[in-house]
Amino acid sequence: MFSLLLLLLLLCNTGSHGFPAATSETQEQDVEIVQKYLKNYYNLNSDGVPVEKKRNSGLVVEKLKQMQQFFGLKVTGKPDAETLNVMKQPRCGVPDVAEFVLTPGNPRWENTHLTYRIENYTPDLSREDVDRAIEKAFQLWSNVSPLTFTKVSEGQADIMISFVRGDHRDNSPFDGPGGNLAHAFQPGPGIGGDAHFDEDERWTKNFRDYNLYRVAAHELGHSLGLSHSTDIGALMYPNYIYTGDVQLSQDDIDGIQAIYGPSENPVQPSGPQTPQVCDSKLTFDAITTLRGELMFFKDRFYMRTNSFYPEVELNFISVFWPQVPNGLQAAYEIADRDEVRFFKGNKYWAVRGQDVLYGYPKDIHRSFGFPSTVKNIDAAVFEEDTGKTYFFVAHECWRYDEYKQSMDTGYPKMIAEEFPGIGNKVDAVFQKDGFLYFFHGTRQYQFDFKTKRILTLQKANSWFNCRKN
């Protein structure tokens, strides 16, 4: 087993470019990470045979493929850099394929009025902060279902919550700082429904380390009968991602309501949906180039692609730029300055790589000279040959000279006049290889700036290598 994984790692390193050669010590550490990960979360040794003695190399490859498919990675059966990166991220301790099931079938609570008890408290936070985090986590689920939760201070509750470390006698020991943050058991008698948090982590109520409210909301989903979701935007996604806004996605809501039924509220709650890159109806809020790559923005997500790696990276905007808001409305790159600008409302942010530049956000009226009637920018693009930036606002476009730092006279003009054929509204635009690509709804127009002609008309998501659009 060890030698097989080492061989797979060597093959990955041989075939990769731009990465330093891994040392034998690093390779051994990576082998150990892969072994432990597949054992803990993908049931690699479910037959009782120790991992180190397994001789069925096909099983290892299949488990790697299973993990890669779950996380939306390129399915190779090899522990490549992307796979290892996901394996090294902090996450929930509940397996992705072998659930903590105490009863057969799909466990659920028969009673919808449940009790919970916090057995002990972490010293990282005040008792009030812990109580509030747990209460809010339960409230997320009660808001979208018929479930109610009552805190008790003594005796046995349906859901017992505790902070423990290492081996805490439930056959699922914690692993110290990082890695496995917490776990919870599905509904059932005894330990069923209980949630355990690793005391070796540092629990917080903000962005630092691990936000207790965020982790508790996930774990209590397991306590209610939910398994992990492959939807990166779902609260039940296994890896820890904290964006500052803890909310249930539509996937989470659909899951809990499939078990317990809809909320008793007269207006049924709904949650944000994660973009499906190959959805033919996909639209974009903003698009920009970034150091040779393309960045597409939708709600709280970005989609990242380039010509060298066909897989689309989908993640939260806040993971890449914590200081940049969700719901961006426009973006453009000035490549020779290595600078990208993001717009929302009357503010804009300038970034270099993953860093927001000092002094931002700034006001669009003061920086660019827009009149007060312009409340926001719909789309923007920097035209490299002329050094001009085009801003699209409703049916008009403005032209800004980046080097003179002033608006050009004669603008605004009607979009249909300046860029004939693309319509009178632009959702997003970028320049690549000398052409402009305009987006409106599900349509994309390739535009030749020199001849003022449309060259092609395609689906908006044609950059994502989808088989069908």
From Swiss-Prot:
Residues bearing Phosphothreonine?
T274
Query: Gene3D superfamilies this protein is in?
Result: Collagenase (Catalytic Domain), Hemopexin-like domain
The entry's propeptide annotation covers 20-99
| One example of a Gene Ontology biological process annotation | cellular response to UV-A
Keyword terms: Autocatalytic cleavage, Calcium, Collagen degradation, Disulfide bond, Extracellular matrix, Glycoprotein, Hydrolase, Metal-binding, Metalloprotease, Phosphoprotein, Protease, Repeat, Secreted, Signal, Zinc, Zymogen
Q: Where is the signal peptide?
A: 1-19
Q: Which GO terms describe its cellular component?
A: extracellular matrix; extracellular region
Q: Which residues bind Ca(2+) 3?
A: D175, G176, G178, N180, D198, E201
Q: Which reaction does it catalyse?
A: Cleavage of the triple helix of collagen at about three-quarters of the length of the molecule from the N-terminus, at 775-Gly-|-Ile-776 in the alpha1(I) chain. Cleaves synthetic substrates and alpha-macroglobulins at bonds where P1' is a hydrophobic residue
Which sites bind Zn(2+) 2? C92, H218, H222, H228
Swiss-Prot/TrEMBL cofactor(s): Ca(2+); Zn(2+)
Q: Which residues carry this modification: Phosphotyrosine?
A: Y360
Q: Which residues does Ca(2+) 4 bind?
A: D285, Q329, D378, D427
What are the glycosylated positions? N120
Record's subcellular location = Secreted, Extracellular space, Extracellular matrix
**Chain positions with Phosphoserine modification:** S57
The similarity comment for this entry is: Belongs to the peptidase M10A family.
Record protein name field: Interstitial collagenase
Source organism: Sus scrofa
